[in-house]
Amino acid sequence: MKKILKSSKSRTILLSALLIGAVPTMNVALADLTATKYPAAETYKPTPIPDRIILSWKGDTATTQAVSWRTDVNVVTPQAQIAVAEDGPAFKAKAKTVMAESSSEVKGNQPYTAKFHTVNFENLNPSTKYLYRVGDGVNWSEWFEFSTASDKSEPFSFLYVGDAQNDILEHWSRVIRNAYSDLPDAKFIIHAGDLINHGDADEQWGEWFKAGGWLNGMVSSIPTPGNHEYSKIVKGEPSGLSQYWRPQFALPENGPTGFEETVYYTDYQGMRIISLDTNVKGSNLDKQVAWLEQVLENNPNKWTVITFHHPIYANSPGRDNVEVRNKLLPLIEKYSVDLVLQGHDHSYARGHVTNKASGQNAMSTKSDTVFVVSVSGPKMYDFTSKNWDENGAQVRNAIKDTQLYQLVRVNGDTLSYEARTATGNLFDGFEINKTPSGQKQIKETTNTQWEKEKQEEKNAKN
């Protein structure tokens, strides 16, 4: 036995030596090889198999649910199946088939044309979990799950992210995935514009959908358009909303005429979420302002959030969205909007209107609005509070060169907010508490990364 073990050991040592001796030769051979980038035209080419599946809402969040997806142009029977979720596979026999209500062909910058389809599930039951899949009757996606909203004001949570825009698959994917990991019960995601860099670049939309993956098919999206969702800007006016926008996002058409699926509102369990298009100016912005006043005046919800791309108070040096601020801020203050969620400036800041003599300001017990600018992608700009300071606003927390995501939880009279860095560190946070009369008190979150850094700076000076 000892001889056998010794012999085996000898052979092992000899084999190891041979392998080690072979390594340099293998490395030389590998070094001579050159990798070739796989073409985007092949990576993102559509097929009969559904992809880019995404949930959104066109109507009542308690009784409807929209889903959009992409195939090649040869699919002529786009459809979806839906059933109340069960613990076993028997639900499939009970699934109802719904034919797509719309299909649109889109030809972007790649040498192929794709077809986008939309189904709007209707007459659903509130507070109910459903399973669905999309396809053509033969080629199907996997089964996805979603839950309808309650028809009452019950607790819920959602995610908010700023610009993804550049190097989306490489750098943004971890952010959106970590966000969901931190808030797996999120009911929707607000995207504050510039989801991509070039509105008609199919490979960029392909990266965006791939980064979110199955999450898009289970959690509804509420997107607002940024300047990069437009083909170009001519004399301050956008020209050509991305041809992908409406085919792939099925959104409410309750906004002013001419702003279908870019200016709209959605009600969810006691909160009204409003999307505005700040890419337009002049009379086109005036139309939105008139519509916005009606939507705010006739608002039965306890909470109100507005999202648009260009900030009321700019973070970036040299930027100043004067018309947006002059036309929107009076209504925001008049109707005590709770949160204004923005993007565009590729840094983070959170603040409020500076204390006024009357006490009507965002940090008093009577007034309210918290303004946030954030970024989730890798494109970064410098930060300055100059535009905030010069226009009667105060920055509470700010950071540059950092990707972030935001978690918002709503429970009755309390809204809590967290801004976390890409790796999950708590950078900023606050809580809004409302009294029955509508007055608000804002409590800053303690023990954040921002607080720790400020304390370290203070200690270093001492």
Sequence positions of predicted segments:
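An acidic-aromatic substrate-binding cleft motif
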Residues: 139-192, 197-198
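Alpha/beta-hydrolase fold active-site loops
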Residues: 155-157, 187-188, 263, 270-271, ...
